[in-house]
Amino acid sequence: MNWTEIDTWIVIIGALCAAGCAIPGTILVLRRMSLMGDAISHTVLPGIAIAFLVTGSRDPIAMLIGAVVVGLITAFLVQAIQSIGKVEVGASMGIVFTVLFAFGLVLMRQAIDHVDIDPDCVLNGAIEFAWFDQNPDGWGIPRGAIVNGTMLLANAFFMLLFYKEFKITAFDPALAKSQGINPGFMHYMLMTMTAATAVAAFETVGSILVVAMFIVPPATAYILTDRYGVLVGLSLGLGVFAAGLGHVSAITVPTWFGFSGTTTAGAMAVAGGVLFVLAWMFSPSQGLLVRLLHNRRTRSHILAEDVLGFLWRVEERSQGSVHTNELHTALGVSGGALSKVLRRLVKHGAISREASHYILTKSGQARATSLVRVHRLWEVYLDKNFPQDSHQLHQSASRLEHVTTEEMQSHLGDADTDPHGMPVPSDE
């Protein structure tokens, strides 16, 4: 890999764009409005085209004003169609997005004859050539870095200025209103930031990367943390890392398969997606692997309690120890899962084993007694408040007994017998 100054600036510009998009993107994700970033990123196209047609140049101020105005119109139309048309927000965004984007493409075709503009550049970007677009007095800094860096600073300024307001309105607009915060103003402030950020990055990196960086880094951070401040910082870091990883991948990975390279903007978006998948799988709090392990432990815990309850009921009928096959048939679980649970219960001293037969120990007896007591109290409670047939009553209690806390048990009351006429064990 032959790294040059151009590669460094490509990564810097991509990182500035990603960080700038991640700031409003974080609020969009928290407000469950991620697709609004997608919609605005595309619907600012008419504003850009109108600015081209009116001014006859690529004046950034005119582009910014046109894009922001159309972005705010997009947000207004989405809310208006949702409330007046009584349709859900996704449908209203789809209507506004497709109509305005198509209108923008029509205008863009008209602008081609009057202004030096490439629609493919606007849609897909040309970050690989951003280094060559420099202002004469720009001290060797690409214009894309200046524009996206300025947008990042502006977004950071407004985020810090309205940090509390953005936080409260993202989670509870009603609470924000009660504290004197105007949720409508904050909403359109967010839409303005989104539209301005989109147009700042459009020509340099294209709409594909803009949309990806609005959504993917904040969504990835959302999986990794539940703290607002950490979420914002993590979104910025993930966006910057995705930009660097994407460019390195764009110039190295294709060579493994005999190709010279690929589009950097697309590779940056893919890198962000890869980071999201890794977070989705391995997040310590919400990752797929953690959930699978938690579900496995939960199933094992429930099966262990079912074994103790079954052994207790067998002893209640004075039938002595229980054979493994009898447990397997009664509980309806696989032999492997049952064997693991039995070994663990023996190891913890809850049951003892003689040949292929099992019996409760003293500690296991106490634990099983408490479990059966809760089960039968649930049957009493459900029969009194939610009458149902005896089989359904037993099944409902069998599920509830595993999740009952001491506070829940205190509301179940007391009883001598359950609806089946069986005695409720004492809690002593």
Regions of interest found by a model, annotated:
Residues G140-A212:
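Helix-loop-helix "hairpin" substructures at the membrane interface of multi-pass membrane proteins
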Residues F101-F158:
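Transmembrane helix-bundle core of multi-pass membrane transporters
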Residues V11-L16, L64-V69, A91-I95, A145-T150, ...:
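Hydrophobic alpha-helical transmembrane segments
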Residues M268-F310, H402, E406-E428:
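Membrane-interfacial segments at transmembrane helix termini in multi-pass membrane proteins
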Residues M1-A18:
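Membrane-interfacial amphipathic/re-entrant helices at transmembrane-helix boundaries
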Residues R317-E428:
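Structured cytosolic domains appended to multi-pass membrane proteins
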Residues T26-I117, A221-V240, V248-G261:
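Short loop segments and helix-boundary regions at transmembrane helix junctions
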Residues C17-A22, I48, F52, L72-F76, ...:
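Hydrophobic core segments of alpha-helical transmembrane domains in multi-pass membrane transport
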